[in-house]
């Protein structure tokens, strides 16, 4: 695979691969400029294309690429919680933030009449590439206590958390609408520790889903709204 850039000798293979997919475009003057920093807009453009957005159709190239990129990325939530100007070079922390947000947007399957069409199953980079899904529910028991039992002896084993009204979202996007989830009929006990102050709270978990939901690897859990 060959790119249009003449200065990618150090890491030529994967830079050229990204060129071939349209994820990167260099400076537009035949140079990739590998030693330069990356701005928020530049990173967002790469992440958008990785999620399936067409750079040409979305206007992410040409003189107005930065404006169009910032607009689309903001709409999709890629810049959520970013306090720095999107045209500034990214810190490592802010780069991680943008990547985290981009993992949570729906992937694009195709374009029809110039409009981006997402997959019917609302897949995201997070679910497609890593098998990670969003789960919501109310914590009703953990190693500290169970809500229906006040005796501490009735608490669950260490490293266990019981959730009721569990919803498994088909998409991990923060903008998922009602109807895009499957609700479990019975409480589910997950293999994860949670603090006592989560009891009675509605929480979100990110899990690497297995056939049996209770056996899924829990990657993170937080109280909704935090």
Tell where the protein language model's regions lie, with residue ranges.
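Phosphate/pyrophosphate-binding loop motifs in nucleotide- or prenyl diphosphate-using proteins
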Residues: 22
């Amino acid at each position: 695979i060959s790119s249009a850039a003449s200065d990618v000798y150090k890491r030529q293979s994967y830079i050229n691969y990204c060129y071939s997919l349209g994820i990167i475009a260099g400076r537009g003057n035949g140079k990739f400029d590998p030693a330069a920093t990356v701005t928020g807009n530049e990173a967002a453009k790469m992440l958008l294309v990785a999620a399936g957005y067409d750079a040409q159709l979305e206007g992410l190239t040409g003189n107005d690429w930065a404006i169009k990129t910032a607009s689309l990325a903001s709409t999709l939530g890629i810049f959520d919680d970013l306090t720095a100007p999107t045209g500034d070079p990214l810190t490592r922390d802010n780069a991680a933030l943008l990547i985290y947000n981009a993992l949570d947007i729906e992937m694009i399957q195709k374009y029809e009449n110039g409009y981006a069409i997402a997959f019917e199953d609302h897949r995201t980079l997070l679910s497609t590439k890593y098998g990670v899904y969003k789960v919501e529910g109310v914590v009703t028991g953990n190693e500290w206590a169970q809500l229906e039992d006040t005796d501490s002896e009735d608490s669950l084993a260490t490293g266990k958390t019981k959730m009721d009204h569990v919803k498994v979202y088909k998409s991990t996007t923060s903008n998922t609408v009602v109807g895009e989830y499957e609700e479990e009929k019975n409480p589910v006990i997950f293999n994860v520790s949670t603090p006592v102050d989560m009891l009675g709270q509605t929480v979100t978990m990110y899990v690497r889903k297995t056939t049996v939901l209770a056996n899924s690897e829990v990657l993170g859990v937080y109280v909704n709204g935090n």
